[in-house]
Curated annotation (Swiss-Prot):
The lineage of its organism: Bacteria, Bacillati, Actinomycetota, Actinomycetes, Mycobacteriales. Residues 92-199 form the Guanylate cyclase domain. One of its GO terms (molecular function) is adenylate cyclase activity. This is Uncharacterized protein Rv0891c. PROSITE patterns: GUANYLATE_CYCLASE_2 (PS50125). It comes from the Bacteria. GO terms for cellular component: cytosol. GO terms for biological process: cyclic nucleotide biosynthetic process; intracellular signal transduction. It holds the Pfam family Guanylate_cyc. Belongs to the adenylyl cyclase class-4/guanylyl cyclase family.
Amino acid sequence: MLFNAVHNSLPPNIDIDHAILRGEDHPPTCAKCVARVRISALGSLDLRYHSLRCYAAPPDVGRCEFVPPRRRVLIANQGLDVSRLPPTGTVTLLLADVEESTHLWQMCPEDMATAIAHLDHTVSEAITNHGGVQPVKRYEGDSFVAAFTRASDAAACALDLQRTSLAPIRLRIGLHTGEVQLRDELYVGPTINRTARLRDLAHGGQVVLSAATGDLVTGRLPADAWLVDLGRHPLRGLPRPEWVMQLCHPDIREKFPPLRTAKSSPTSILPAQFTTFVGRRAQIS
């Protein structure tokens, strides 16, 4: 098998289909994987798949990260760093913006200019430290987007951002996991749209997650962090409501007003003030 040829060893419980070697311009087929498999194609066309690395990954890792041949030609010609390219396949997106950004710019433009410069540095450092990729420096206005192959890394990054002093800025952060599409190295499609709508529900200082992301990070949260079930809420312009969770930690604010939505579907078993705690058995006991 390919892994054996490259690394002189065979990872347990993984059977990689030999179709990987065909150089096709779509993600390779992976069969009989006990864990999800992350595939990274590195190097130039001369190396082809010699530097392809296949390895078992924890369950919160996206299904597949694959650089097709035509894109590798562009990478080689432009001298780009493959590790900093936006991941594709199943990823967790972090989308954040500055609460009341327009008002802050009007009231204290000089302070905001300094704060935004500090924010840019803080965001870039946090994303890099947690293995994420920022496709563009700015997404819309004072918002930004980052992509992570591990949902737990996205949650840790969001937590670090909220724990950092950014005054007078307060960030609203939304996390969602799903299939993504790239167009001119920018994410488009339903996954980023849903992430943006989740972020719009949040208040400054708050991190909200979709049910998909919440499932992936349960049991893999940073130390002392936990999730709170906020119930199911409609998302503006989207047909399907979302079950929303909040990422909490002793170092950040926990109590917020109701989410920024016109109405909530009364599907939670308990009232909002008695929401379900997830991943906090030790503190509760």
